[in-house]
């Protein structure tokens, strides 16, 4: 029996889960979601969680391992892991956390690395399959996810199990594919010294595309979205501008042409980058489209054009025909990954 404490720690919320592993099955013993802004540091969250566990379970079982996926860079210095959650001011130290939890080792991993491990624990109902393909055992697995930014990672077989390797693929150059995307690139170059694909294929990118189309003065802007975008432009990054644009684009009654064209450009740019990652990895173990945006715009990604653009790679398009491609629907994939990794320590 293995008892694991796992966490998915983001800028606004933290989800902690205590789970028991028997053979390959996990049983959730207790879990709780915390609003990060309500706590001065992570230790306060941890103490409250442990106290709640004791109330719920009668006592806290002896932990076998703990792993926390954190929305920030992880630093490894002489086997000591540290991390910083910038917008909350929280700091993490693996040695200190191990002392607090009375265990030998605590693992800190980047939140997108946690997503990488998480795809190994997903069930069929957690996925929407774009292309069934043919799985080749122990082949590379690719993971890409648009949220606030754009995460990319891959899984490689180490002879015993899969290991996740983080990349900074979201910061590679944006490559426009047509005249309108060239205009978009020129527009963004007025703001930035260089334009990464993350500037387009992300939640921030959705707003940037909207601003580009709005400033061309070719499509009328709706007052509701205009208000949210103006708040975003004034520094309120939690104005939900991107979500409002996506929702309007999918509305059967709204018919917001500006939102619809924004999401068309976003979806096509995202598809092109998914295809780029597929070419670089040849992930015959599967390619997983994760991140917070995909499940929310699933109808747009179910359109056959999304898959067509993924595979539209000219002379080498045929290389992608047999790669299994899935959209991750389970929002707890990062927590699942932290749980799986924690159990392997």
Outline where the language-model segments fall.
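Short beta-strand-loop/turn "lid" adjacent to the catalytic site in phosphate-handling enzymes
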Residues: 55-108, 113-126, 143, 296-299
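A general structural motif
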Residues: 1, 60-65, 103, 138, ...
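Active-site nucleophile and cofactor-binding loops and adjacent substrate-binding regions
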Residues: 34-35, 84-89, 107-114, 133-136, ...
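ATP-binding/phosphotransfer module of carbohydrate and carboxylate kinases, centering on a glycine-rich
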Residues: 1-56, 183-345
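Short glycine-aspartate micro-motif
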Residues: 4-8, 63-67, 107, 141-145, ...
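Short, acidic Gly/Pro/Ser/Thr-rich loop/turn segments
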Residues: 14, 73-75, 149-153, 208, ...
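Glycine-rich phosphate-binding loop of actin/hexokinase-like ATP-binding domains
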Residues: 129-132, 136-199, 203, 298-299, ...
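Short, electropositive alpha-helical surface patch
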Residues: 120-132, 343-345
